[in-house]
Amino acid sequence: MEEFDSEDFSTSEEDEDYVPSGGEYSEDDINELVKEDEVDVEEETHIIKGTKRKAERFMPRKRKQGGLSLEEEDEEDAGRESGGSGSEEEDTATEQEEGTESEDARKKKEDELWASFLNDVGPKSKVPPSTPVKTGEETEETSSSNLVKAEEQEKPKETEKVKITKVFDFAGEEVRVTKEVDPTSKEAKSFFKQSEKEKPQPNVPSAVSSLPAGSGLKRSSGMSSLLGKIGAKKQKMSTLEKSKLDWENFKEEEGIAEELAIHNRGKEGYIERKAFLDRVDHRQFEIERDLRLSKMKP
């Protein structure tokens, strides 16, 4: 037994290189071998194709009919370069032409707009030839003359007022009062009517004087004269009116009418205080009235 075992162990190394004959292969072994062969073939084809592509990339020259075509390639490259430069020059020329055309069109538009603006503004800004240019002195003279004319026109408006003289009887004395009023006022109209009535009547014609002395015409004229005297009786003036008249005359003589008016319009003036007290009384009356009305309501 020991010898058999030693022989088996000695022959184990030789079994590694042992290849059985074709009849001893199984179907599985054959399929595996076929697959391995196909994989090896595919790998070889891939390697061959890769080497061909690399060779095509690194080939510096082309062969045409067994000869080198370096000169033809140089000519083609030069033609391409010249064609590229020519196309670039054409592009730049076309761009320049388009730029000049756009500038010309822009200038034309600006000129048209300026011309239309001048047409719109031109006739208004023109100075009429008939009117000469005035200097500063002439303008001052014209302005001063215009002011004088305006003052002259305003003067008659101010002097349109009419002076009225009224005669009053105060304690047997005759008092004359002069006023300046508008001609359209009631006092002026009444004064004009009264003055017309007081005018002397014209002489009676000769035909009337030839009548007998005992006629009724003389009686009528005598009665009218008596009625006129009665109508022309002087109006009486009260003491209050006389004092007021004297105060107005004093203010005019002293020239203090404006100062008194300004003082009276102030807070310390008598008129302003009186108006304030009147407003207070009126307000107090309104408050009392509201209270009475509120109490009367149910």
UniProtKB/Swiss-Prot annotation:
Residues recorded with modification N6-methyllysine: K218
Keyword Ubl conjugation: yes
Extent of Basic and acidic residues compositional bias: 103-112, 149-159, 179-200
Modified residues (Phosphoserine): S82, S85, S116, S215
Annotated ranges, domain BCNT-C: 217-298
Crosslink feature (Glycyl lysine isopeptide (Lys-Gly) (interchain with G-Cter in SUMO2)) location: K149
Keyword tags: Centromere, Chromosome, Developmental protein, Isopeptide bond, Kinetochore, Methylation, Phosphoprotein, Ubl conjugation
Superkingdom, taxonomy of origin: Eukaryota
Main location: nucleus
Further comment found in the protein's record: Gene duplication of the ancestral BCNT gene leads to the h-type BCNT (CFDP1) gene and the p97BCNT (CFDP2) gene. The latter contains a region derived from the endonuclease domain of a retrotransposable element RTE-1. This repetitive sequence associated with the BCNT gene is specific to Ruminantia.
Function: May play a role during embryogenesis.
Entry protein name: Craniofacial development protein 1
Organism: Tragulus javanicus (Lesser Malay chevrotain)
Gene name as annotated: CFDP1
